[in-house]
């Protein structure tokens, strides 16, 4: 009887060692801890003689047996998001999945919750989705970037190929200059900028290309010459009217002219009976128009707009004599 009981005890000890899989170093550390506790707490000789280092930790054996899973926080978050029906979860839902799946994190909660939050914010493979206005709750949703599908090696969450970095292809930058600019930059609420007037998207590449195109067009187009009238084809009276019409839109103050041009302009003004006052509605007699005071008033050739078709034909045909005054009808 005694031999069989002794053999069963030896087999039980060997089985426990194989299951736990601990080497000599942890055993030595546990023995040192037990020695420290033994110095502080009194023990009986029988208990010290029959004490087993693996059975002495019966109260905390379940807690110490919990092993941390060999997955990174990115892998844990990816697991949680992929198992959800809508492929999106909030921070609290991600932590709930990890706690339910792994007892180690359930025992350590909430010490690792901030680590999950930091990994969601700092890694480009996770995209934040704002909560819908009609969906009550707290916190935003998190989902996976579509381009991060091959982030893990052969679909194994134990190995990750490389850190995922969200990048934009160079050809898309040149093809769509305003791709990086958000739509909110060009709109004010649901009506957009100025209720439907869309601003052109600005990008340094597009601005540089537009500037180069403008320079090329400026080199290709010949400089345009100002139109010049042919004085030989017009009668003298029509020449005076054309000179008066083409001069005063550029310079409305005859006082600023040189003396030689002031005499010519005053003679042209004396032959015309139309002034600024006549256009506004004031009536001036011929004496006031021919006076020196009236000669200094700038004149706009209203006769080119208001005279009759018969007088225009006579002027162009050469029958209008110099000095003839055109009257307004």
Swiss-Prot record:
DNA-binding region, residues: 68-162
GO BP of this protein: ectoderm development; forebrain development; mesoderm development; negative regulation of cell migration; negative regulation of DNA-templated transcription; negative regulation of transcription by RNA polymerase II; nervous system development; neural crest cell migration
Keywords linked to the UniProt accession: Developmental protein, Differentiation, DNA-binding, Neurogenesis, Nucleus, Repressor, Transcription, Transcription regulation
Classification via InterPro entries: Fork_head_dom, FOX_domain-containing, TF_fork_head_CS_1, TF_fork_head_CS_2, WH-like_DNA-bd_sf, WH_DNA-bd_sf
Highest taxon, organism lineage: Eukaryota
Function text: Transcriptional repressor that down-regulates bmp4 signaling in both mesoderm and ectoderm. Regulates mesoderm patterning by repressing ventral mesoderm genes and promoting the expression of dorsolateral genes. Can also neuralize ectodermal cells directly. Inhibits neural crest migration. The transcription factors foxd1 and foxg1 mutually repress each other to pattern the forebrain.
Name by which UniProt lists this protein: Forkhead box protein D1
Species this chain originates from: Xenopus tropicalis
Gene label: foxd1
